[in-house]
Amino acid sequence: MNSEILKKAIAVYGEEPQIRQCMEECAELISAIVDYAESDEADIDNIIEEEADVLITCKQVEIISKDYVLESADNEEIKAEDKKTICNYTIKVLAEFIKTLNKYLRGKELPKYEICYQISNILLQFDFFNALLKLDGVSDIEKQLNHKIKYKLDRLKERLEKSE
């Protein structure tokens, strides 16, 4: 992910608005996951788009919190876990992150590792969730996600260039 574009967006739009944007994107992904969990005809494109938004904004929050570099765990396999269990846990991880960001915005003192720890949980949970999508017959998730992230970063770059 192009950190320079993300750093410029933070500088142009501000830290708090970008953190709020991350909270909003998490909420939108929760909504998309709920739709997926409750329906056999979920909008996979919407899930991928919302996940891309969360990944981009989490990277911005990671940049804002500065001190930690996070690595996503590589999980190739997923046990035969229930779809609702994985969806519910993904929602829980995203909701916990929203609560942490809200505390941060209210000026509550948080250990530096807390935000980074939760971002790493989100990234790890995305590995499980994407594995579930694969088991459900969705192919090329990583390719679709990378394409969507590139599109969104290019669009952000254009907006930033226009604002100069």
Task: Place the predicted regions along the sequence by residue.
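Flexible "arm" and connector segments at domain edges
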Residues: 1-164
